[in-house]
Amino acid sequence: MFFLPGVLKNGAVSGIIILRIRSESDDIMVKKVYKHLDKLPKGSASDKLTNGCLVLEGGGWKGLYTVGVLDCLMMNDINFTSVVGCSAGALSAIGYVSGQIGWGARIDLTYRHDPNYCGIGAIKRDGGVTGFTYLFKKIIKDLPLDKKRLCDPSRRLAVSATNLVTGKAEYFEKGKCNLTKAIQASATVPYVSKPVMIKGVPYLDGGCAEKIPFPWSEQSGEKKVMVVRTRELSFRRKPGMPGLAKIMYRKYPNLLESMGKANENFNEMVQMLEEKSENGEIFLIAPSKPVKVKRFDGDMDKLAALYWLGYNDMKERLPQLRAYLEK
């Protein structure tokens, strides 16, 4: 259990909230590192650009599926000109846009049990379960990004975050915002994290309002769109929202309205995406097996297996993706 005093003093309950945010298999006193890090792919992606937009769903540690897909794309010279991500998808997008093969997997499978990255140290420093300060100031020094490529204007990157005042998803694009702050907002898990303030406005995880940031690709007029899901195609969410939301976010009625509709909107969106995929309008990839990884899972073998599932699913479907991009 974690005790979070005053975790949401900006417009929500202060005091003490007790929440379990780790799986039963975790031992927060012991730092665990995946034993087969040396088998993960590594290197730099080619400079080749692929016209189109990559849309990345969130999902906590389920995002390792996305990381596997992205590494396979880079290994095969498929580097989309536009990427939009939500929550874990926003974090995964950094390594892809900067062309760092294996970057996301090495971070998650090395630092998952480091409390500064995920745990008490992160809560103390950043007010939430993910250690963004540790990620952007320490981890990136150990596993550097190609900043020149990341800042290249020919490679668009946008992330979505939920505006607590309007209750709507907003998109922040590289070159037009403080990208690290926007990514932090996009991946700030509700209930266990303080909102991130951007220009005086509080934001939380993009998934609170919109779990798959597909609308950005439509607004941008993209002709070719690839969507990466983090749950199997058959997955649907139950209507409603956690009762805790009505207590913690009672000062934000628009947010509560959005959260109350989010699961139904998600179900409608995934149905629409499947229809567009069947019609050849988009390319959709999702886990070929049911995903057993939980939001805060700490089983390193399960996490690594999900990464390799993403990598191998994408490898198997490369001919279909190339055919879609070429038509």
Predicted regions and their residues:
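Aromatic (phenylalanine/tyrosine) cluster motif
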Residues: 2-3
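Short, positively charged and aromatic/hydrophobic N-terminal segments
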Residues: 9-12, 16-20, 27
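Patatin-like phospholipase
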Residues: 24-86, 94-327
